[in-house]
């Protein structure tokens, strides 16, 4: 990891030395490097972004306050095409943690059909599909942290068509290994994902269906209704593509997501529902029982249950935004995980859209059988 970081830092250093006197036509937020071949046989865009964060936590149990300042994310990403605009690619590297996030090729082989191959995000809940650069609050919700499909390696088939003048339909199907990021071991079984997206009033402006906040101030109502079904065969990890590795007998996991995303004239709303269950057998893999055969402690289990996340914001004319979120997590009772409810209120100041902004939020977390907790976060986003 250290060698990789050294190589990246050295490359950027020499790039800055060699080109420090050049004048570029690139505006801020449009990438550090934008190059296209003279014969148009390839094109690339390279960008760098980072987030710095302050986080403070107040525990009502003992009235203690703990805080820290840290780098939340730092990433280098590249995209473009090779040979033909129909063969695109995306690459993203996590400089902060030292591993590859995305390495995917996208081939538009005919009409409205495109196949993706490599490692990238699966088409799960809408909040996860948003880039972490383009969030409305400081970070994603508890629904995402407990139920997300995250990233995986495999193949995706994507298609879209339009009814009449405006009604857009998008379909996404994927087969992946099921264990998540950067796995080197053999897969225990495959993961199958299907998603459908319905946009009855047509496309959002500038792909606004895939970023939070109505920065484009939609002049007419835009709406996306979506559903995702995921089947993870012989899931090796407690939350499918994420979580701890299961040591006992493996089960299949079945996950359902329903979401809606709406924007109009500075107002934005999205809601998500998630449900995960084991398809064969109990979610509990190993437990301690009393003499009556009732579970008194769970030693190992899959994280199953349901969650609801609702989020809304309003963008003022001066590019300040206020936003609020309610998230409820209800794990399956047999796993003995606690119900959680979280309330979040936040603000954003968009200087250059999602490329340069300051965000802050405050959250109250209520967890069954525990004292409440309060969290305050302040974050900056800087994206070339």
What is the predicted role of each segment?
Residues 1-23, 384:
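Bacterial Sec-dependent N-terminal signal peptides
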Residues 19-46, 203-222, 352-356, 371:
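Outer-membrane beta-barrel biogenesis signature
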Residues 22-23, 35, 62-66, 91-92, ...:
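Outer-membrane beta-barrel domain signature
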Residues 25-27, 67-70, 95-97, 146-149, ...:
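Short sequence motifs at beta-strands and strand-loop junctions characteristic
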Residues 31-181, 185-202, 221-224, 308-316, ...:
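Outer membrane beta-barrel
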Residues 58-64, 96, 100-104, 129-132, ...:
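Outer-membrane beta-barrel translocator domains and adjoining extracellular loop/strand segments
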Residues 187, 197, 206-331:
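Detector for outer-membrane/organellar transmembrane beta-barrel domains
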Residues 192-203, 347-349, 356, 371-384:
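Outer-membrane beta-barrel "beta-signal"
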